[in-house]
């Protein structure tokens, strides 16, 4: 089954063709990061307009790269939530038009479900059930994946997403947007241990997380040092910040394995590319005797192939949409439209 897939939830326009949920025939991504870096973050209106300009050409490109014609497409999948509403709407509108023109089913895909499914592209042996740690710029979740299209949220951030905090910390340290990779590179220059940063505890919800206090602490450290004319050890702060984020994520992920009785942990999302978090997950899973799947870096960020992968399994589960499908800025992972 050849699925033409679209992802436009933030600042990447991504289109792919995926066969049977596992084989990527072609994929293309147009990033707007350099443009949004001028503003220190994503400007929703600009993102939406750039999606409109790029999506048709990328669609032609992936079909050509895959050696397919439009008649070879069996279904269309698209991210319909969550994300920047204008950006998501561009992808949904184009996907609906494509499905109608081709006379094929339209498959709605939750963005975070797509991130989790990116691992299916890299690991043919991976099958549910497992626990997923989905960490990105807009979402931070622990998910019980009972089956390919049957998932429940076990824990989530109560405020900021982990990736959002990395971007904010990078900005106060004078690093470019997006901040995840520059922060990681800076952190490799220090062993850390210099700055004591707060760790949150959410009463009554042991798998929930909070990153707003950590973000505020880093901002205050940087501003106070500037006001006092003191030198800030940026590499040490970047390292200690990454360790603090990892300290929120990894113990909760391991606890989720205990509570569910699962023996496999899957990481997903852009923040899963962070070297400190990856190393901590590897150590924790080795100690617990759990299997760990870390996505290759190419599948950590937003891409169309992950939507095609999850779209296949949503289709097998009977989840298709009519042409009145809408776009949503927010949506729970387990209670889809």
Residue ranges and their predicted role:
Residues 78-102, 275-283:
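Short Gly/Thr/Asp-enriched flexible loops that form oxyanion-binding sites at enzyme active sites
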Residues 185-265, 274-288, 315, 335:
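A contiguous, well-structured pocket-lining segment that forms one wall/lid of small-molecule binding clefts
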Residues 2-82, 111, 115:
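N-terminal beta-alpha supersecondary unit
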Residues 13-18, 132-134, 140-144:
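Short beta-strand scaffold segments in enzyme catalytic cores
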Residues 124, 147-189, 215-216, 220-224:
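Glycine-rich phosphate-binding loop plus the immediately following alpha-helix
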Residues 1, 109-131, 310:
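Conserved phosphate-binding catalytic cores of ATP/NTP-utilizing and phosphoryl-transfer enzymes
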Residues 108-109, 282-307:
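Conserved phosphate-binding/catalytic loops in two-lobed NTP-binding clefts
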Residues 295-333:
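Glycine-rich phosphate-binding/hydrolytic loop that grips phosphoryl groups
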């Amino acid at each position: 089954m050849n699925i033409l897939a679209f992802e436009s939830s933030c600042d990447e326009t991504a289109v792919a063709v995926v066969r049977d949920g596992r084989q990527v025939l072609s994929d293309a991504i147009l990033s707007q990061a350099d443009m949004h870096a001028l503003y220190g973050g994503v400007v929703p209106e600009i993102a939406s307009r750039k999606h409109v300009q790029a999506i048709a050409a990328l669609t032609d490109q992936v079909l050509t790269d895959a050696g397919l014609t439009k008649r070879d497409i069996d279904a269309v999948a698209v991210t319909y939530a969550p994300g920047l509403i204008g950006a998501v709407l561009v992808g949904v509108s184009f996907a609906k038009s494509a499905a109608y023109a081709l006379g094929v089913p339209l498959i709605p895909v939750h963005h975070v479900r797509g991130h989790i499914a990116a691992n299916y592209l890299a690991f043919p042996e991976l099958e549910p059930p497992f626990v997923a740690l989905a960490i990105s710029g807009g979402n931070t979740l622990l998910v019980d994946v009972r089956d390919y299209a049957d998932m429940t949220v076990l824990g989530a951030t109560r405020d900021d997403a982990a990736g959002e905090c990395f971007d904010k910390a990078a900005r106060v340290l004078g690093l470019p947007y997006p901040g995840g990779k520059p922060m990681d590179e800076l952190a490799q220059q220090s062993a850390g241990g210099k700055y004591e940063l707060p760790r949150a505890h959410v009463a009554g919800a042991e798998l929930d997380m909070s990153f707003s206090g950590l973000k505020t602490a880093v901002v205050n450290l940087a501003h106070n040092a500037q006001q006092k004319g003191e030198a800030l050890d940026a590499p040490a702060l970047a390292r200690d910040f990454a360790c603090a984020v990892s300290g929120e994520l990894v113990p909760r992920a391991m606890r989720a394995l205990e509570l569910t009785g699962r023996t496999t942990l899957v990481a997903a999302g852009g923040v899963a590319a962070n070297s400190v978090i990856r190393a901590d997950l590897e150590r924790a899973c080795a100690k617990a005797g759990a299997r760990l799947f870390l996505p290759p870096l190419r599948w950590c960020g937003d891409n169309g192939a992950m939507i095609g992968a999850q779209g296949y399994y949503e289709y097998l589960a009977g989840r298709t949409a009519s042409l009145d499908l809408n776009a949503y800025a927010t949506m729970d992972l387990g209670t889809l439209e």
